[in-house]
């Protein structure tokens, strides 16, 4: 799994990660954008702190599946720091994080399915 963030220069780092994985014959399940946005606690609007996401374009450029976008969440960060992540948030993780985990699991299982025997 390649993890990126919304900044423009990150696409250069993604290129290095993809090239390294290909040279080492390591399959890439997809790409996740971390720190994608923060949700305003007053109005619920998503604010793109680091600028507009270019995740879809980066993913398309390397033929990667977008597995999800994770927000900046101060409550999640505090729970991680306190070691109380399992009890601090509903179901232990943000819904976005759960969706990313499920997408990774689906991709991993799809890649792990045995090939059809040759006739």
What are these model-derived regions, one by one?
Residues 1-9, 14:
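Inter-motif core of Ras-like GTPase G domains
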Residues 18-119:
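C-terminal lobe/tail of nucleotide-utilizing enzymes
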């Amino acid at each position: 799994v390649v993890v990126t963030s919304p900044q423009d220069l990150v696409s250069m780092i993604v290129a290095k990660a993809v090239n390294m994985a290909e040279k080492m014959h390591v399959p890439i399940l997809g790409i996740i954008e971390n720190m994608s946005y923060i949700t305003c606690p007053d109005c619920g609007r998503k604010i793109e702190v680091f600028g507009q996401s270019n995740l879809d374009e980066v993913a398309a450029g390397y033929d990667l599946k977008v597995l999800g976008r994770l927000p900046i969440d101060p409550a999640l960060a505090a729970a991680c720091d306190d070691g109380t992540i399992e009890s601090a948030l509903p179901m232990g993780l943000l819904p976005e994080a759960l969706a990313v985990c499920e997408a990774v699991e689906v991709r991993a299982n799809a890649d792990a399915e045995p090939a059809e025997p040759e006739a």
